[in-house]
Regions:
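Conserved substrate/cofactor phosphate-moiety recognition/catalytic segment
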Residues: 21, 25-69
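Hydrophobic anchor at the beta1->P-loop junction of P-loop NTPases
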Residues: 8
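ATP-binding Walker
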Residues: 14
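Small-molecule kinase domains that catalyze NTP-dependent phosphoryl transfer to phosphate-bearing small molecules
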Residues: 126, 130-176, 191-201
Length: 205
């Protein structure tokens, strides 16, 4: 199986990072979660369960770009890579995040395989309150989490694998992803391109 950049997309509490860890038990992979970049800043300013100002998001994006530039030159060629993000349809900041990962996959000469995780609100509320999320400086306030995603839809890249994991374990989801990767290993993954057609106004919380 050729090396792949797996892009896990979902709302807070949908199980992106937990699924990524389960994937690492099946395939040799390196996780580059959104919190890897965000917590460089969030660990200093402590904005858990709070709105993040736009200017701070821009500084986080600058940190991210520098880390990706390092990764481009020094990535482990024998490993798959797993990225995670909450990408909102119509959000220009999230468009930039997505485009940066697409561009990185091209520079690393890896196919990009997007997986969108869907989860009902009842399970999101339950999952978002976990102790593990608190330790990782993630959103843990269920009311804030639901308000943050209210009226928003996930961005679904062309060719994405969509999984409703409301009643699935992370291990089951990881197995589904690997099975799909094996089906597509002979160059059948849909080529993912940079997007430039989203709205200009910002909708990110």
């Amino acid at each position: 199986m050729g090396k792949t950049l797996i892009y896990l997309i979902g709302f807070p509490g949908s199980g992106k990072f937990t699924t990524a860890k389960e994937l690492c038990k099946i395939i040799g992979a390196v996780i580059a979660s959104n919190n890897l970049f965000n917590n460089i800043i969030f660990d200093i300013v402590k904005l858990q369960n709070a709105e993040v100002p736009d200017d701070l998001w821009e500084k986080i994006f600058a940190v991210r770009e520098n880390v990706l530039a390092i990764l481009e030159k020094h990535y482990v060629k024998s490993k798959h890579y797993i990225f995670t993000n909450e990408l909102i349809e119509g959000d220009p900041y999230d468009q930039r995040l997505y485009n940066s990962v697409v561009n990185l996959s091209k520079k690393m000469d890896m196919e990009i395989f997007s997986v969108v995780l869907h989860c009902n609100n009842e399970k999101l509320v339950r999952r978002v309150q976990s102790e593990e999320r608190y330790q990782e400086n993630k959103i843990t306030d269920p009311d804030f989490a639901i308000k943050k995603i209210e009226g928003k839809r996930l961005f679904i890249p062309e060719g994405s694998l969509e999984i409703d994991n409301s009643n699935l374990s992370a291990k089951e989801v990881a197995k589904k992803i690997v099975e799909e990767m094996k089906k597509e290993k002979n160059g059948k993954l849909i080529k993912t391109s940079v997007t430039n057609h989203l709205k200009t106004e910002r909708t990110r919380g």
